[in-house]
A protein has these predicted regions:
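Hydrophobic, proline/glycine-rich low-complexity stretches
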Residues: 2-105
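Hydrophobic beta-sheet segments that form the core/acyl-binding groove
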Residues: 87-137
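Single conserved hydrophobic/aromatic residue that forms the stacking wall/gate
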Residues: 142-152
């Protein structure tokens, strides 16, 4: 069975932006440290957060019945509705320009940067590249370029 992908339709998602605001409170930092089995300490406003905490920030609230079969938000809102059954993370390039700090109001700005369809050994592949900027006071502190591979 061959799946058809309308690349012209999918490319309409290029440039789509989604902004989610989050707040780094001391308890957010402590919960992250506890997750990593670290001493939770007593973080104060202005302290740099533990490396990797940005992965916990800026997630959209999605009701259970709005999830796709892979438990991610259903395709077609931010990410295009690629008609392939598997979604895989294909890696990231991360640039930390400045640390996020406890007390920061962080805006995670997500942008669909590119969409490409390719033929692989196992069939059709669609690469959706999203870029994520974590903004504090309109300055990008962390930039992530992340291709996601959807495949048959």
């Amino acid at each position: 069975m061959s799946t058809k992908v309308d690349i012209d339709h999918l490319r309409k998602w290029i440039g789509k932006i989604d902004n989610v605001t989050d707040y780094v409170t001391p308890i957010v930092e402590q919960r992250y440290r506890a997750t990593l089995n670290m001493d939770i300490g007593n973080p104060k406003d202005g302290d740099p957060v533990t490396s990797g905490l940005h992965w916990m920030l800026g997630w959209n609230l999605v009701k259970n019945d709005e999830l796709g079969v892979d438990s991610h938000p259903a395709l077609g809102e931010f990410l295009p509705p690629v008609p392939l059954p598997r979604r895989m993370w294909a890696g990231s390039e991360i640039k930390v320009l400045k640390p996020i700090r406890v007390g920061d109001k962080v805006i995670k700005q997500s942008t669909v940067a590119d969409i490409q369809v390719k033929e692989g050994r196992t069939g059709l592949l669609c690469f959706v590249t999203a870029e994520y900027n974590f903004l504090v006071n309109d300055l990008s502190l962390i930039h992530i370029s992340e291709p996601t591979r959807l495949s048959v």
